[in-house]
Amino acid sequence: MEIRNIKEFEKASKKLQKDTLKIALALLFLIGAALLALIFGQANSKGLLLIFAAVIGGYMAMNIGANDVSNNVGPAVGSKAISMGGAILIAAVCEMLGAIIAGGEVVSTIKGRIVSPEFINDAHVFINVMLASLLSGALWLHVATLIGAPVSTSHSVVGGIMGAGMAAAGMSAINWHFLSGIVASWVISPLMGALIAMFFLMLIKKTIAYKEDKKSAALKVVPYLVALMSLAFSWYLIVKVLKRLYAVGFEIQLACGCVLALLIFILFKRFVLKKAPQLENSHESVNELFNVPLIFAAALLSFAHGANDVANAIGPLAAISQTLEDASSPMGSTLNSVPLWIMVVGAAGIALGLSLYGPKLIKTVGSEITELDKMQAFCIALSAVITVLLASQLGLPVSSTHIVVGAVFGVGFLRERLREQSRRRFARIRDNIVAAHFGEDLEEIEGFLERFDKANLKEKSLMLESLKKSKNTAIALELKKKEKKSLKKVYKEEVIKRSILKKIVTAWLVTVPVSALLGALLFVALGFIEKYF
């Protein structure tokens, strides 16, 4: 008893030390954000207010890293394509690069079109709206991370701006037309994610998983899938990065993307051919070919997430900074470029939040939503890559959470349909087998089929292997080759595990109203503090 208590005390002590170190690092980062605002911010006499806003922006960025980045690397970690440490390192680097290189366009979207300019002409009121929205979004994300619920950072910030804007100038201040486009993108994104993931999962099943010679099929198909992913990402990079230096037409963009995709195809084809002698003709062995593509997908998603969701952390901060520099036009239509120091606060905050507090939700997304193998994880990741890059290019602050979970929904729905079909197929196969046999063998065969129907996946695999080895048994002799093949196909199509989605769906539903309520309350609280203190 005493030894157990000592071990529990040591465990609690180590956890406390670890948590204390995390808090210390987070505080150091917030101090760094304040120093950046002090040194590089140009807020004239309102420097203290800008420093406070920078701290809140850094706090928001850390919460985005802790909560939202899990969607990018969760499938890769959950399928064991990459370790937790490797995933965090890749995601942190790519998040920072995406935020700094390609994050400006979405920042401009967040910055001035959610609240109609003509309703808030006072710079002081506008700054309070932005502060309230930023803090409300950060607080809700913090709570969601503590309870282990991956939520939309876009929903959190937009809800906060809505609530604070309505508290400041009423419902008429909200640009409902613009928000309707954002809401539409929130619906379209998970739907696109689901449909694309379903398509690729079915494609992989038809072209690889259901083939007798899985090894040869995978060596042919996987390089094309990687090339497609490369095309999407390279085209995105050309559009987002090169357009700042030199404007190119669509034809040139597509041609450059195709050239890069072809190069990746050739390199990856050589890679899989070198790996071919080590592969076996089995599902598990073929799965290993998806390791590198999954790591590649995690990097792409992280880059796109940094480009897209950095706006949620620094959009309001950029608006506050610009307003403090030019108070005469707080909601003007002309948007200045976002200062580099603000981009650094957002990018570094996301990377630090991921490193310190990201593993919890990475495990949630990677294993609790659904149990994935590498093929299924690749379908989800590829679907998310295509959807989120398209959305980011359009300048829409969509939710990567919705995209990834939408893809999981799609994969789960397809697997559920396949399971139902496999059950019906098994019933037909059973009837056909029973009808074709009689006598003493029939009783033994019926017993085998009943055990097969009730067995889990691992047990089914062992039972099918026993048919190959037990050539002298009645079952092995009486079950025809075609009947064994049919049973094998039923085994392949059974679903491993149903997704646990209630917590995530509930979090989606309450994010906007909760963040809006917090935004309104914080706006009122800021006004009260300024008036009486």
From Swiss-Prot:
Transmembrane segments: 23-43, 47-67, 81-101, 129-149, 156-176, 182-202, 221-241, 248-268, 286-306, 338-358, 372-392, 509-529
Domain of life of the native organism: Bacteria
Topology of this chain in the membrane: Multi-pass membrane protein
UniProt GO cellular component terms: plasma membrane
Function description: Potential transporter for phosphate.
Molecular function GO labels: phosphate transmembrane transporter activity
Keyword Zinc attributed: no
Localization annotation: Cell membrane
Keyword Transport tagged: yes
Keywords carried by this UniProt record: Cell membrane, Membrane, Phosphate transport, Transmembrane, Transmembrane helix, Transport
GO terms, biological process: phosphate ion transmembrane transport
Designated name of the protein: Putative phosphate permease jhp_1384
Family: Belongs to the inorganic phosphate transporter (PiT) (TC 2.A.20) family.
